[in-house]
Amino acid sequence: MGTYPAFSGSLQLPEQRLHGTSNLHPAGGYRIELQVQDATFDKYPAKQHAQRVAAKLKKEKGLIFLMGQKAALLEDSDQETRFRQRRYFFYMSGVNEADCDLTYDIQSDKLTLYVPNFDLRREIWMGPTLGPEEALKRFDIDEAKYQSFLEGDIKQWASCSGHGSTIYILHGSQKPTGDFPNVLMDSETLKPAMNACRVVKDEHEIELMRHANRVSSAAHIAVLQGIRKMTNEAQIEGSFLNTCVSLGAHNQAYGIIAASGANAATLHYSKNNEPLKGRQFVCLDAGAEWDCYASDVTRTFPTAARWPGTEAEQIYALVQNMQESCILRIKEGVRYLDLHYLAHDILIHGFLAIGIFKAGRAEEIKKSGASSLFFPHGLGHHIGLEVHDVSPDSLFAQDNDRTTDSWLFSSTYLSPCTASSPTLKSGMVVTVEPGIYFSQIALDNAKSEQLKHIDMDVVKRYMAVGGVRIEDDILVTKDGFENLTLAPKGQAMLDYIQQGNGSCNI
């Protein structure tokens, strides 16, 4: 059992969050109230995860060994690096503490955690470290021991298991310490099996991701409520971090992107230090982490409670249409790459309507790759213990004889937005994050077959928009989806900017 800052208060959500079939825009908007208070959470289901991995391995015997992240010092310094637990280790332990290892004996179904040996000096300076007795109370394990027992326990297991027994490890560099001459070290089999398990989330994992999204959505709302008084991108980043930390989320799932104006056309902009004056839009891509689980949320908004111009409003509406059209089609069995193609189709028809693309056949424009100049990334990716979470391709990818539209596809796209990815499965969590970007460097390096479809005189009117991206985290269900992300969009977003005091209580 653990004590964490927990969700509390009232929450008004769009109906689609629960059912995935209704209006994406609740008439009353969104209301999130979060506060820090003590609450008891169930144990992370580490033992169930170990059993799932063993079943995926399809082995009756063997020992799984996973090495946790070690505490380390910065180079030429006595200061420790920021600790980040190895995600595969966390998946089978639920332990977010340094210097731990674990074993899982497949045959006996025994999960053992090894914690750091008692160190009096460290206890005095840094406080109590995790001991065996506490570990047994807090975590879903069968046994807890000090690290000093690990080598002897593995040797005893090897002796009982016989010559040629196998220890399954993630990497050759993560072998258990010691000499085990009659044991095979298999570093090829475990990772694909764990990936196949990690990509489909259980209810405990989903609830952690719901809470990460609650915190992130509250932080996005706090930015909206304060944006009219902000003058620099750094203040946006600071506001977001302040809300997250105040609500108990001390880690971000990735580096915050607070990009205003033309900076929003840089997909992974990170400087976050330019003035907002004269900029039409801010693209804020930021997501908190909760108990090692990520959220990934992007909102694009003006610095005032109104659209900065016709062009900005048109592009925002087009991206919102791209996103919502794709989200509404999500359910088990859908091929995600088809949603990526749908987003491009909507972009192309939208650009034809506003004149960015010259009159012509949409299919010809599509084949030229012209739309990829403005939407150069994949529609989304898996999310979980990593913001760009693992892919299941290696174990249950399916043959797909459908032609890949190479003009809309890049080898840099992440699963499930790849040709080899399996169809969506209930329990997967994916992002849906279409965007439209007016990048001068992309246009300057465009191919002639792309440029012939683009009216550059019209494009000039839209360059000041910079970039618009909207991103939500979507849980796939049997019959539809659940949108885990609660931050407002569109008119509801403008209303929060106008209110400036709102109802996101911290």
UniProtKB/Swiss-Prot annotation:
Needed co-factor(s): Mn(2+)
Signal peptide start and end residues: none
GO molecular function: manganese ion binding; metalloaminopeptidase activity
Binding site for Mn(2+) 2: 285, 296, 471
Keywords: Aminopeptidase, Hydrolase, Manganese, Metal-binding, Metalloprotease, Protease
Residues binding Mn(2+) 1, per UniProt: 296, 433, 471
Coiled-coil positions: none
Keyword Ribosomal protein: no
Catalytic activities: Release of any N-terminal amino acid, including proline, that is linked to proline, even from a dipeptide or tripeptide
Transmembrane segments: none
Enzyme class: hydrolase
GO biological process: proteolysis
EC number: 3.4.11.9
InterPro entries on file: Aminopep_P_N, Creatin/AminoP/Spt16_N, Creatinase/aminopeptidase-like, Pept_M24, Peptidase_M24B_aminopep-P_CS, X-Pro_dipept-like
Cofactor binding: number and manner: Binds 2 manganese ions per subunit.
Task performed by this protein: Catalyzes the removal of a penultimate prolyl residue from the N-termini of peptides.
Family: Belongs to the peptidase M24B family.
Name of the protein described by the UniProt record: Probable Xaa-Pro aminopeptidase PAAG_05466
